[in-house]
Amino acid sequence: MLRQLYQSLALVAAVHATGIFANGVDIESLFGPYLSPGTEIAEPTDADFSTVASPRWSEWKPPTWTGAIKPKTERDLQKIVRIAAAHNLPFMATNGGHGTSLIYGTVKGIDVNLENFNSVKIDIEKNTLTVGGGTKLGDITEPLYNAGKAIPRGNSPCVGVIGATIGGGIGFNTGLFGLGVDALVEVRLVTATGDIVTVSEKRHPDLLWAIRGAGANFGIITEATFRMSDQPNNGDAVIGSFVYPAEGALAVFEELQSLDYVLPADLGVQLSIAYNRTINASELTVDMKHFGPWDTFVPHWNTAERLKPIARTIKNVTLVELYAGLDGPCQSGVYVSGGTTGLGRTDPQTMKEVMDEMTAFYEAHPGFLGQTLFQRYANNNTLKTPLSTAVYPWRDTKNFWLHENIYTDPALEQPSIDLLLSLRKKLQATSGFDEPHIYVNYAFGDEGPAAWWGADNLPRLRRLKRRWDPKGLFGRGTPIF
């Protein structure tokens, strides 16, 4: 199944990529005369290509860029879309460069770097935050903190705000505020015709429904507006990190199971399985982010201590400090592939089997640097929002499993993929769900649209795709088909 999907997508990409580049037309001549001063254009052979193209987090199956454009204005984006469409030139708008779907490896086209669309505007009177298409999560942390406001958001500061949101938008504060898509109230969108439309609950509400979960498939979002909430605990938080040996992991997994129905909204928990090469043993780390006062964190600390950690770190921090410390995915230059499945229940024995399989893999492959994460965020507020408001379907997910294969030796590619698929199969079998719940931002790429957006949503989603993007210009990483 994986090989067939990959081959069919590669064929589609090859068909779209033929034509103008094969005829030797360069993008400077094609686009340059129509774009504003300050717009940068580069071919892959140009010395400045790496500064014009968006930097990419992972070396695994990257797109093949036939050129790069860094536009200055919204009008530039309109012209880029129109010219590219007229000449059958594939392109992709990029910001953080964090997508790791295997489908990206089939993409061949122009990188449209949104770096110049980095803007943050807070309107206290309207209680909204508006960001540009090139804004990263790290850019909004301090302005929101200073304003005493918050939005549901992803974690890592180098990830794009809009990209993280339009796939769903989960993070440590999901328990308090729900999903990012639920706070998204309006976008400005460059469509497949090069027109700009404002999309909101009053204007094109059907399209807003689709953007809330599958937004990359419908155009280039130049600006997005979010409804804000008041900042929790005056912008202060408590973070705790507890490390456990492999032999104590089952007890930790059983404790996580006890949180299936009682996780407090102000507590985000992440478990990570990794390998300590110094002592040659797997370790389980429990990271807690508590968006409340110290005294309400103490019971969670006591529980963590009862499980006998071998190391711990506990600190009072501001929200600015909390998010600045989540910069792990900001490192680049290595091969990273990822995969996921959503869990509706915690099965301690399966999680222990995952850790055992990871340990065996670490020992067999000393160059493997990857990790497996279990992200547990309360979903009470997520469930309060009706399913009908967004194409994002998996509100009943309690635990987001994210596996990251990380390595520098390309020879580890296939063994690490085999590991990912094996772990995914194990976890899916005891997830409590009959159908895979795939958080599209974490997708490996072989799961398909029904797993990303729900089979019941596909007829409506496909109709909207045919209406707004009939030639399939957008959404090349996780396409609607």
UniProtKB/Swiss-Prot annotation:
| Biotechnology and industry use | Azasperpyranones display potential anti-cancer activities. Azasperpyranones A, C, D, and F exhibit potent growth-inhibitory activity against the A549, HepG2, HCT-116, and HL-60 cell lines, with IC(50) values of 2.39-14.42 mm, respectively. Moreover, azasperpyranone D significantly inhibits HCT-116 xenograft tumor growth in BALB/c-nu mice. In addition, azasperpyranones A and C can bind with four kinds of therapeutic targets for cancer, eEF2K, FGFR, survivin, and TNF-a.
Sorted alphabetically, which Pfam families does this protein's record hold? BBE, FAD_binding_4
List residues of the FAD-binding PCMH-type domain.
58-231
Q: Matching InterPro entries, A to Z?
A: BBE (IPR012951), FAD-bd_PCMH (IPR016166), FAD-bd_PCMH-like_sf (IPR036318), FAD-bd_PCMH_sub2 (IPR016169), FAD-linked_Oxidoreductase (IPR050416), Oxid_FAD_bind_N (IPR006094)
According to the record, which residues are glycosylated?
N276, N280, N316, N380
Task: Report, from the record, the phenotype seen after gene disruption.
Answer: Does not affect the production of azasperpyranone A.
Instruction: Tell me the first and last residues of the signal peptide.
Output: 1-17
> What are the UniProt keywords, alphabetically?
FAD, Flavoprotein, Glycoprotein, Oxidoreductase, Signal
- Enzyme class, UniProt record, top EC level: oxidoreductase
Domain of life per record: Eukaryota
Give EC number(s), comma-separated: 1.-.-.-
Q: Does the keyword section mention Flavoprotein? A: yes
GO MF annotations, alphabetized = FAD binding; oxidoreductase activity
Induction profile: Expression is induced by the azasperpyranone cluster A-specific transcription factor ATEG_07666 which is itself regulated by the azasperpyranone transcriptional regulator ATEG_07667.
UniProt xrefs under Gene3D superfamilies: 3.30.465.10, 3.40.462.20
What is the annotated role of this protein in its UniProt record?
FAD-linked oxidoreductase; part of the cluster B that mediates the biosynthesis of azasperpyranones, members of the azaphilone family that exhibit anti-cancer activities. Azasperpyranones are synthesized by 2 clusters, A and B. Cluster A is responsible for the production of the polyhydric phenol moiety while the azaphilonoid scaffold is produced by the cluster B. The non-reducing polyketide synthase ATEG_03629 produces 5-methyl orsellinic acid, which is then reduced to 5-methyl orsellinic aldehyde by the NRPS-like protein ATEG_03630.
State the family named in the UniProt similarity comment for this chain: Belongs to the oxygen-dependent FAD-linked oxidoreductase family.
What is the protein name given in its UniProt record?
FAD-linked oxidoreductase ATEG_07660
Q: What is the lineage of its organism?
A: Eukaryota, Fungi, Dikarya, Ascomycota, Pezizomycotina
